[in-house]
């Protein structure tokens, strides 16, 4: 099993007739999935998603793949193929189309509908190509065949990419639910047929590679959801991803069965469910869905609300309800159902929301106390099954953290794949498929690109570190007026502190330290204001840590008298 070396350099030119594969996101993390395929001088991109920030990234809205390595080759991109409509696969497309707006975007009907609604908010009219399972389309030197796969969102697709270098099969996100709500199963016959033709490189979903057995069917959630609808004494508030059409269908069915009306809450939820309903993916009995205004006329035990916020997002509807910052007020007897998984890194935010809801008297039903969620990803048994029918010559696990990628690679080896042909890559690692063998040949830039409000890429790791320091340690501004002739303090320095323990006398002990620092600088001939500010910042920082065990952000200002 090959792993990326930390000292990887830039990759050499791609040999003629070969194919280059570079993941710019989705490896070593759950999110911002984006894979670039290069062949015959052209580029094909599969997915372009976002990653949601952790608590250590304050102020960040989303994290994008790094487009640096393809920015000077935008005209070589023949298409962006989208496997399905989740944010971690389509959320980055608006930012890529800002770089070149006429890139063809390829996807299924629901995927493109979700994307077009998103792009409308960005003022972008995309050039789209609608495909469905069984279709085969050419994009430059890439011959793409689309295969139905089952996932937690309708219309998901795998893609087989044929070139002169060989065939690559990318599963996208998938599982093998044999009793899916929409009766659309993963097309294992197509996988087997492609395997017989010869799959030279298999890129497959690693999310649940550590989980033994097979992923539970979505239908097994029906009893728990129905029980909530049947036994809840007052309102039922269901929180889910705004794109989880299957789960929301189950909620609608259960609400209808028990005589409840349903209202959607949250802009993305209202938008996406409207799209799914219009396209026929969400079946809504007449009169079931009403506006929140109409709910005011109904008794509480006849009300169900479906909202966003299952991951504790601070601006989502459920979080605002928990904080009493929403028109819908949670009260005693309400039941809140968190009908989604807990994404790693969001635990603290979710538990804060649960505690807030509980504080106001709600009963919270979640994965920890009821069977209200199943994964949308294949477990180890399903992955082994796929390896055995696809029989790939080379394997590159995708979509997962390091432990998931490694576990998936181990499964491939157990099914007979040569360990030397299992490539464990990470974001930015270059994998070349040449003469039927996949190998790591180099690396390209693949850092985090932060979206902060309207600004893309302005926030850096250094600025995020400053934000964390501000939050944890506070900030101290020191203004020192210095005699231009002597270099000594002309008067006592001014201090302005925020988030740092202090009173009127807090900074008196540091004044002699500042005086000594400036005197030493004068003796050594240091007169440049920037250098003096650095010395001043260091002196105050050392004093703050020595006396208060704190590391505030120090902002020094030197003014010549």
Identify the function of each model-found stretch:
Residues 27, 51-55, 59, 76-77, ...:
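A glycine- and charged-residue-rich anion-binding loop/surface
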Residues 119, 412, 544:
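Conserved hydrophobic residues forming the short capping helix/wall of the S-adenosyl-L-methionine
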Residues 525-561:
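C-terminal tails and terminal domains of large nucleic-acid-associated
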Residues 141, 156-158, 302, 473-477, ...:
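Broad gene-expression machinery/nucleic-acid interaction feature
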Residues 210-526, 533-534, 538:
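Hard-cation-handling environments
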Residues 2-81, 86-298, 316-329, 348-352:
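His/Asp/Glu-rich metal-coordinating catalytic cores
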